[in-house]
């Protein structure tokens, strides 16, 4: 029983770190997509460049073994930013 209690805080810390990394990966892709969207709207970069850079970033992260636990968050962020009311036109 004592051993189980001593392991529990470690498990909680691992779960918290995992949740933070999920949020980080979601925010990273959504943030990159949003930034590129704004640059296209402001006519600072071409649509094709933004689309290619965002999809390439998502592909690279999705293929990385280190990011395997976060593929769902990466894909959700990509879907959400490409369907965003403002950015939809940029990524279609």
Give a label for each model feature.
Residues 1-2:
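Sec-dependent signal peptide recognition
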Residues 5, 18, 22-24, 64, ...:
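Generic detection of intrinsically disordered/low-complexity segments and helix-coil linkers/edges
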Residues 7-9:
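N-terminal signal peptide c-region/cleavage motif recognized by signal peptidases
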Residues 12-15, 70-72:
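Structured catalytic/translocation cores of nucleotide/phosphate-coupled proteins
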């Amino acid at each position: 029983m004592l051993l189980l209690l001593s392991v529990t805080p470690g498990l909680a810390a691992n779960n918290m770190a995992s949740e933070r990394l999920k949020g980080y990966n979601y925010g990273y892709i959504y943030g990159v997509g949003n930034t590129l969207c704004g640059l296209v709207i402001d006519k600072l970069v071409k649509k094709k460049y933004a689309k290619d850079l965002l999809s390439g970033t998502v592909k690279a992260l999705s293929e990385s073994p280190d990011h395997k636990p976060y593929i769902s968050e990466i894909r959700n962020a990509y879907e959400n930013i490409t369907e965003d009311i403002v950015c939809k036109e940029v990524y279609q």
